[in-house]
């Protein structure tokens, strides 16, 4: 499977935020019974007190995660819902990190449009 850049993270507390993100993504792996579905960019960029790095996922990992969450909640149709889950978890951890899609358009938008109407 190929790796795609999915989320872009801006963080002021690199160690705390990376720990929180690893926790939430490990939970995702447990939910769908898949290992090594995500990884972080090998080098973070540092500028003016902020750390910037990318989260890469395997296409199959994110597809299974969306399908799993869609079965639990039919409103989940693409990885936008996964982004909201991650953002909410970071808020609960009182993190100031900002996470967004690495590009303008979600990866699976076209794939799930016809499947999950």
Predicted segments, located by residue:
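Short, extreme N-terminal segment that most often corresponds to the first beta-strand
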Residues: 1-25
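Short intrinsically disordered terminal tails
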Residues: 1-2, 115-117
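Ser/Thr- (and often Asn-) enriched beta-sheet segments in non-cytosolic proteins
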Residues: 5, 54-56, 98-100
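Charge-rich, solvent-exposed alpha-helical interaction surfaces
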Residues: 17-20, 24-31, 64, 81-89
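Structural alpha-beta junctions
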Residues: 27-39, 90-98
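Conserved short beta-strand edge segments in small beta-sheet-based binding/regulatory domains
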Residues: 71-116
């Amino acid at each position: 499977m190929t790796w795609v850049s999915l989320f872009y993270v801006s963080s002021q507390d690199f160690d705390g935020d990376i720990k929180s993100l690893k926790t939430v993504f490990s939970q995702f792996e447990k939910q769908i019974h898949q290992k090594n579905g995500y990884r972080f960019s090998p080098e973070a960029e540092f500028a003016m007190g902020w750390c910037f790095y990318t989260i890469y996922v395997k296409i199959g990992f994110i597809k299974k995660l969306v399908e799993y969450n869609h079965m639990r909640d039919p409103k989940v149709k693409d990885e936008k819902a996964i982004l909201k889950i991650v953002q909410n978890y970071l808020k609960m951890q009182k993190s100031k990190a900002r996470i967004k899609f690495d590009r303008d358009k979600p990866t699976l938008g076209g794939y799930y449009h016809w499947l999950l109407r």
